[in-house]
């Protein structure tokens, strides 16, 4: 275990940061890749009441559809030395070590939203959401679902210029999707939302943030759809595995 991994494993959110989370309006978006998290977030951010919380990472910028990720827009790209400094100074709300890289949300990002009276919004993985929920039950967690397996597959395919490239990457994404759905369905705090229209999805999320909507029959109904999607993805994964 290297020093950075050790620092993350033993990282403790400072009390003042926990208090900040408890007294903030925070919206966390999760979902399988291709479900529409980014597009939904963009619709929400058209409303000036929301502020995008940009995570820090030590990984290098990637290219998506021929366009390179931008520092300060997609992520705050930092060096390992800077990450180590921030961890030692306890400047993160939460941090994790994934495939040799650091990912984390800084205290400063949440403070900026609070100073402007805004709702902090970010897309984050299941583990990160669990860390936030330990700090405050007021944090709103939303899991975005595609309408069904075939729609999800079609949306995902639109990202690729060749069918061969798509099929290769799609097969790799199936285990990740299975894991995310399994973990999300195991906990009670997610609002599952069926993303059949990005504008409508953003509208529903905005209602949840402002009306403190309790879980109701609709949540139960969409959870059933989530389980069906999980079954379909497992079936496809088993099919691909059997063909190898």
Regions from the PLM with identified roles:
Residues 57-120:
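ATP-dependent small-molecule kinase phosphotransfer cores
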Residues 120-125, 134-158, 194-195:
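Conserved phosphate-donor/acceptor-positioning beta-strand/loop module used by diverse small-molecule
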Residues 163-210, 217-244:
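Small-molecule kinase domains that catalyze NTP-dependent phosphoryl transfer to phosphate-bearing small molecules
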Residues 29:
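Hydrophobic anchor at the beta1->P-loop junction of P-loop NTPases
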Residues 37-38:
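Walker A/P-loop
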Residues 32:
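P-loop (Walker A) phosphate-binding loop of NTP-binding proteins
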Residues 46-54:
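Post-Walker A helix-loop "phosphate-sensing" segment adjacent to the P-loop in P-loop NTPases
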Residues 1-26:
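Extreme N-terminal, non-catalytic leader segments
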